[in-house]
Amino acid sequence: VFNYRELAQKYDVPAWSDAQVLAEVLSRKLQQSDPLEAVGELHEEVVGTFSFVAITERGELIAARDPTGLKPLVIGSFGFDYGVIASESCAMDVIGADFKHDIEPGEAYLFTPYSIERKRFAEPNPRYCAFEYVYMARPDSIINGISVYEVRMRIGEKLAEEAAVEGADVVVGVPETAIPFAMAYANRTSTPIHMGFVRTGRRIRSAIKPTQFERLVGVQLKLNPIRRAVAGKKIVIIDDSVVRGTTTKNTVNMLRNRLGVKEVHVRIGSPRLIAPCPFGVEVPARDELIAAHLTDEEVAAVTGADTFCWLSIEGLVEAIGTPREHLCLGCFTGQHIEVAQRGMEFLKELKEAVAG
């Protein structure tokens, strides 16, 4: 929510975070309006996006998704009379609930002890986050009616079509997001796939750690290579994304120098990350993004790989199977969706007003 500080000032509430301000403003609206009407009124004042669940003082549950549907929100049932809301459908599976469907962009639901109400508070303008399918979501989820696992398998097939490595001995996927990419790539290229790394059990998003030391240690702590699977071989290593390139460089160096891998060809299951995300995903500034400044050959040289290729934007769109105009691809194109442009203009005007 780009204008959360302005909303905090208007409603005289603390501005600790956009989520906290959103909750405070919704609380004020609920004092004067029906819950579903309050969501519509909240939307009218927000410059940004949201998918949220809130509980009222009366014990009612509100779930709402903004018109872009940028982030997922799903609805399910548990038993005969319990409703369930989650950010991804896999949560329903884990607790034994039945996944029903996505909450559509611009929709809100109200759950009471006796009923469920649905209201469309704004016309849908879908701009689904493409990075959810590549990296953020779990593979056992269904998002916007599309299986994340199937998208990732199609991504692997697209990688094979666009950047196959001839004469490779082994395909290795970096656990665990890239495993479906690697499986499909190996199948399409008729190359054996091996388990090149073992997870240590630590779940660390190393790519988005704030310091280089944390990123390097994160890789060491979460992955341990299997020497017998890769030593002396020409391998294709497939990963989900590359941010700064430091963790990839560390991985390639480990494969070459510690394990004696003959050749390392890196294939990435997402397009080049060339711009930060204004919606809270921890992608660093453009200056830190290796793909924004270097060619494939230069990235290969920096990381120590023999070759280095990303999936094309067209390949990603085809793999997802959603019309391009309904996706947010801003981190790959540098052209963010309309609400982000509005938000950044708002922040610029606010900064100028404060400075003036």
Predicted segments — roles?
Residues 1-104, 110-169, 174:
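Conserved short alpha-helical segments that host acidic/polar catalytic motifs at enzyme active sites
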Residues 43, 58-60, 65, 96-98, ...:
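PRPP-dependent phosphoribosyltransferase catalytic core
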Residues 61, 70-71, 92-94, 117-118, ...:
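Flexible loop/turn segments at secondary-structure boundaries
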Residues 166-177, 181, 265, 309:
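Short glycine-rich phosphate-binding loop at a beta-alpha junction
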Residues 171, 178-185, 189, 193, ...:
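Extended, hydrophobic alpha-helical segments in both membrane/secreted and soluble proteins
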Residues 190-236, 245-246, 274-284:
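Short, glycine/charge-rich flexible loops or terminal/linker lids adjacent to PRPP-binding catalytic cores
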